A protein has these predicted regions:
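Beta1-alpha1 glycine-rich phosphate/pyrophosphate-binding loop at the start
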Residues: 2-76, 165-188
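Flexible, glycine-rich terminal cap/loop adjacent to redox cofactors
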Residues: 8-13, 20-29, 38, 240, ...
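A Rossmann-like FAD-binding core segment of flavoenzymes
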Residues: 27-34, 71-95, 100-101, 169-266
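Short hydrophobic core segments
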Residues: 101-111, 232-241, 310, 388
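Glycine-rich dinucleotide-binding loop and its adjacent helix/turn
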Residues: 110-170, 206, 264-266
Length: 454
């Protein structure tokens, strides 16, 4: 008999599991895969939407595969289909039509949904979030129609900043309001975040440490109240974070953790009553995992993390046996030409969890000083005091940030120290790098003694 696999969710996490199962199964294996997706499109790359809004390409290029691409492979790929409930005992998923879909293995990839701050006016026309293709289309339509003169973004995270750049590039007066004292506070320390603010504030007004109190207007948004001051706005983007979509899991009795995500074990299995369920897996935005530095529960709402988790889920369904391990969640983004990357803990997060640290910041160049078209690069490295192991990194430059963050992610996993960075052989060509790299200089500036053998 065929092994029935039902995947709930058709974002990056669900699609990754589907494709890995389809590619990884042995010819003798008989898998019957059903994917339930509430949206109407096949595979749409949400990560690319902010750049489409900036005019780099159309939203249409983000449609990677239509539903029939998967259906032609024998996959029961259902769009505009909602799961209503899960019966863990009888092993079936009830969908809106009343059909009961039996499963041998269930994959929860239900994603996340925008957090809407409790304030008046969030239902007015012209107020948007950015978490779906439809959201992107509505914003793009308003921008192309020339309907927006003043835009206000609530939230100073990746999506909010990238959207603000898109608005300002179209000549729109743009304000970003962030309740915390600096931008990207879960990823960067304040002095690093200030570099981004200084880079952008020629075109964007930042209201930091402020809270939007109300969105005002009759039918369409007209202004936003921040403290006692009223800011004109004919478009508002609420980008105040994403919350795991766990209603279905919670109603089924699956455990929801401290982070708000579905509790998982190392095999990405969901849990009930403190025990893992061998045939129910969870991954992506809705999954709670364990942080590799703090060892506390956390979320990692990144497509890149979801891909690794999907490999674990697919291998376990196929019987290979696989473990996810601890989560580092390396991130990188392009903010108006400035590449910003982060991995591990910030000094603030380390302080919150009582981790004693040393840190060093270096400003260098991406190439030899004499080489044309040189770019400045700023790196901050954070080490645990007693072991001098690397536990965090933040890098800002116009180039080479992603590859450096990937390198340091592996370094944290392997437990490298400041001395390891200082003593490691590195390649050199003046057109590509400096003899003494910015990471080496940052490790020395941390105060660790690289001359001491360990």
């Amino acid at each position: 008999m065929a092994k029935k696999v039902v995947i709930i969710g058709g974002g990056a996490a669900g699609i990754d599991v589907l494709e890995l199962l389809h590619r990884g199964k042995d010819e003798s294996e008989n898998l019957q895969i059903t994917l339930l997706k509430k949206e109407k499109e096949g595979f749409f790359s949400m990560c690319g939407v902010p750049y489409a809004l900036q005019g780099m390409y159309s939203l249409g290029v983000l449609d990677h595969f239509r539903p029939d691409f998967y259906q032609d492979k024998g996959i029961d790929f259902r769009t505009e289909t909602r799961a209503i409930s899960i019966n863990l005992k009888e092993k079936f998923v009830l969908i809106e039509s009343g059909e009961e879909l039996l499963y041998d293995c269930l994959v929860m990839a239900t994603g996340s949904k925008p957090f809407i701050p409790p304030m008046p006016g969030t239902d007015l026309k012209g107020v948007h979030t950015l978490s779906s293709r439809k959201d992107g289309e509505l914003i793009a339509s308003a921008l192309s129609a020339g309907e927006v003169n003043d835009a206000l973004v609530i939230g100073g995270g990746w999506i909010g900043l990238q959207a603000a750049v898109a608005f300002s590039k179209k000549g729109i007066k743009t304000v970003v309001v962030e309740r915390l004292p600096y931008l990207l506070s879960t990823l960067l320390d304040q002095e690093m975040a200030s570099i981004i603010k200084n880079y952008l504030e020629q075109d964007i007004v930042f209201m930091l440490g402020e809270t939007a109190e109300a969105i005002q207007g009759k039918d369409h948004v007209e202004s936003v109240l921040i403290g006692d001051e009223e800011f004109p706005a004919d478009m508002v983007l609420i980008s105040a974070g994403m919350r795991p979509d766990v209603d279905l899991a919670k109603n089924a009795g699956l455990e929801i953790g401290q982070s708000g995500g579905i509790v998982t074990d190392q095999a990405m299995r969901a849990q009930k009553g403190g025990l893992p369920l061998n045939n129910v897996f969870c991954l992506g935005d809705c999954a709670e995992v364990i942080d590799a530095v703090t060892f506390r529960p956390r979320l990692s709402q990144l497509a890149s993390t979801a891909l690794i988790q999907a490999r674990v889920v697919a291998e376990n369904i196929l019987g290979a046996g696989s473990s996810y391990g601890l989560c580092l969640s390396p991130t990188v983004a392009n903010i108006s030409g400035l590449q910003v990357g982060s991995v591990g803990v910030t000094t603030e997060i380390a302080k919150r969890y009582g981790i004693s640290i040393k840190s060093g910041t270096s400003v260098r160049f991406t190439k030899a000083r004499f080489f044309p078209d040189n770019k400045r690069i700023i790196a901050k490295l954070i080490f645990e005091t007693s072991s001098e192991k690397l536990i965090g990194a933040q890098i800002i430059s116009e180039e080479t940030v992603a590859e450096r963050i990937n390198e340091l992610t592996l370094g944290i996993k392997l437990g490298i120290t400041a001395r390891d960075i200082w003593m490691r052989e590195r390649c050199f060509d003046p057109s590509l790098t400096m003899v003494e790299d910015v990471l080496v200089d940052a490790s020395v500036r941390s105060g660790a003694d690289p001359s001491t053998k360990r």
